[in-house]
Amino acid sequence: MLERTLRVLEYNKVKEQLLEHTASSLGRDKVKHLVPSTDFEEIVEMQDTTDEAAKVIRLKGSAPLGGITDIRSNVKRAKIGSMLSPNELLDIANTMYGSRNMKRFIEDMVDNGVELPILETHVAQIVSLYDLEKKITNCIGDGGEVVDSASDKLRGIRTQIRTAESRIREKLENMTRSSNAQKMLSDSIVTIRNERYVIPVKQEYRGVYGGIVHDQSASGQTLFIEPQVIVELNNALQEARVKEKQEIERILLMLTEEVAVEADIVLSNVEVVANLDFIFAKAFYAKRIKATKPIVNNERYMDLRQARHPLIDPEVIVPNNIMLGKDFTTIVITGPNTGGKTVTLKTVGICVLMAQSGLHIPVMDESEICVFKNIFADIGDEQSIEQSLSTFSSHMVNIVDILEKADFESLVLFDELGAGTDPQEGAALAISILDEVCNRGARVVATTHYPELKAYGYNREQVINASVEFDVNTLSPTYKLLIGVPGRSNAFEISKRLGLSDRVIDQARNHISTDTNKIENMIAKLEESQKNAERDWNEAEALRKQSEKLHRELQRQIIEFNEERDERLLKAQKEGEEKVEAAKKEAEGIIQELRQLRKAQLANVKDHELIEAKSRLEGAAPELVKKQKVNVKNTSPKQQLRAGDEVKVLTFGQKGQLLEKVSDTEWSVQIGILKMKVKESNMEYINTPKQTEKKAVATVKGRDYHVSLELDLRGERFENAMARVEKYLDDAQLASYPRVSIIHGKGTGALRQGVQDYLKKHRGVKTFRYGDMGEGGLGVTVVELK
């Protein structure tokens, strides 16, 4: 991209505003080196990245980029063995914390369902160096001082220093408080000179205290003397301070070496947070100028909706719709000077430069922009004093350069094309130049005040006229771009408003050809039609926005309704589960009582005790279960139930054996030690046991109950497996098994953990352990039952 183009389109001013939104010198460095890209894929990714950061700002308001500094030179010095200062190490720790904090911030948003695929990829590159970070902050305080707790040795040395200082001060203060000292001292204070404690002694008493003179006052009347009695103490203090300095240097070298070990990771993290600072600066700038993400296409057309110049106050500037590249490839904006034509030209150019830099642009949603390999701009009066070139010559030098380089991947912007010379020749040159650039396939926006170019827009298929609206009532431009309508001078209307007589104006009209008058009238009608069409469009757009608002409100209400419904269902489900859980606990207690009855002696179990236990067990079923319909899967006409068949009683989820049919719809069923009547509709056929030698059986089933000593869960889904474990343990308890095995396999460990978590809470489990070598090892859990 030509440097001149960036300058005349004020690209650097946009960068200056962008700099204000960076959080660190790292981000500022990225902004300073920012230039527009010409790679389509890169531009799309940059726009998507800025959009993700803008989403974060919309949801969170900001991003935690504080505390990050440019530590790259410090880290490189650490790599070559230089000792870093406490503040330099603290900057490294703070930057490590900042990068770790930013990583956690983005990952938390992603975990909460916010889609940030690009930013997630960025923070995934950040490697946490928490241990090194804590080592530094444990050794260095917020003020940059090495703290006592940095090492036991340093703590001991500083204790010695404080003790020595206390003893010295105590001796000196005793000396200054004595009655004789008042006349010998200039002041009753203890001070420090050359890092040694001294007292201010009058010149004539210098020999009283002995010791060492370290300094004197400006008048020479006071000497700062270290009395002989504290010389040894001061010497000991100095020795301790030397040891302190050596220990601090050792600690700093140790920390520096640890930074050097992790230098590559630290530098990599710094590069990531520098990019994040840069990305979020673009997002904050987009918020500031009310910019949006454009749709980037590679089909060489743009559709800027309600485009604004980013450097002009959005409350002041008039937004415009600018289309180029589909129905026409060249826009010629005609009309008088000071009408806003140049602002429109610059708006097109700066929006393209910003979009190709990954910046959002000040337009409405759904605006589109294409990628140009080159952008050429001939804007403004840039006379070359050194080359003694006129305005026309200066422009022509630029135009010659443009004509040499422009092609079908170029955007060309001409301001006042052909100006600065004879109007007739200038208009002819402008037409030829436009033809040349258009024939090369470039996209062109040109401004001119030559009326000859109005006809140009009608005579060329890919060219369209445009103008900036002028309000004759206020005698000022409205800055509204009218595409398809050439500009008018409005000289007669302006003159009339300013008081020129109708007679003079009518005479002036007579000097203009009939064709010219017709053209002016036609243009006036076009302007009126354009205004009406735009008014209709604005009304339609307002209705569309209102419809979208209503649609969003309806969606919100639907979401709230669904959330409330789900919340109520969840609450009802939770209440149901609580009732079922309470029923299970009660049933377990009853089963335990029945087991105790059986252990007593089968002959001692009275009928009324069984009837009472049966009633209590049935009463333990929660209302939700009692009321729900039972889905019978097995009682098809082909399967006739017979005495001895094994069935599942659906109400209790327990296996039982049919004893005898007591009515057309009921059977007497043996469930563990209970015998009860159950309707066929409440049974599920399991199988018919093989005929074995019949034994005399009491009304209680013994250890020939059909429950396996092990439960194999391999291949089961987690939820199904947990349901089977629950049922199996109940069956095993009814069968009075002291020990059972649950085979869950090794796998990922999820099923094993789930089984053991359940066993911890089961009231019927005494203990459990992993299987021994011969029992299946970690793939099996052996359960001891109560």
UniProtKB/Swiss-Prot annotation:
Origin superkingdom: Bacteria
Keywords from the named record: ATP-binding, DNA-binding, Endonuclease, Hydrolase, Nuclease, Nucleotide-binding, RNA-binding, rRNA-binding
GO BP field: mismatch repair; negative regulation of DNA recombination; rescue of stalled ribosome
Enzyme superclass (EC): hydrolase
Keyword Cell membrane: no
Family under the similarity heading: Belongs to the DNA mismatch repair MutS family. MutS2 subfamily.
GO MF, any single term: ATP-dependent DNA damage sensor activity
Protein name: Endonuclease MutS2
Domain Smr: 711-786
Gene name for this UniProt entry: mutS2
UniProt source species: Bacillus cereus (strain AH820)
Keyword Cytoplasm: no
Binding residues for ATP: 335-342
Stated role: Endonuclease that is involved in the suppression of homologous recombination and thus may have a key role in the control of bacterial genetic diversity. Acts as a ribosome collision sensor, splitting the ribosome into its 2 subunits. Detects stalled/collided 70S ribosomes which it binds and splits by an ATP-hydrolysis driven conformational change. Acts upstream of the ribosome quality control system (RQC), a ribosome-associated complex that mediates the extraction of incompletely synthesized nascent chains from stalled ribosomes and their subsequent degradation. Probably generates substrates for RQC.
Entry's EC annotation: 3.1.-.-, 3.6.4.-
Assembly behavior: Homodimer. Binds to stalled ribosomes, contacting rRNA.
InterPro entries xrefs: DNA_mismatch_repair_MutS_C, DNA_mismatch_repair_MutS_core, DNA_mismatch_repair_MutS_sf, MSSS, MutS, MutS2, P-loop_NTPase, Smr_dom
NCBIfam families from the UniProt entry: mutS2
SMART domains: MUTSac, MUTSd, SMR
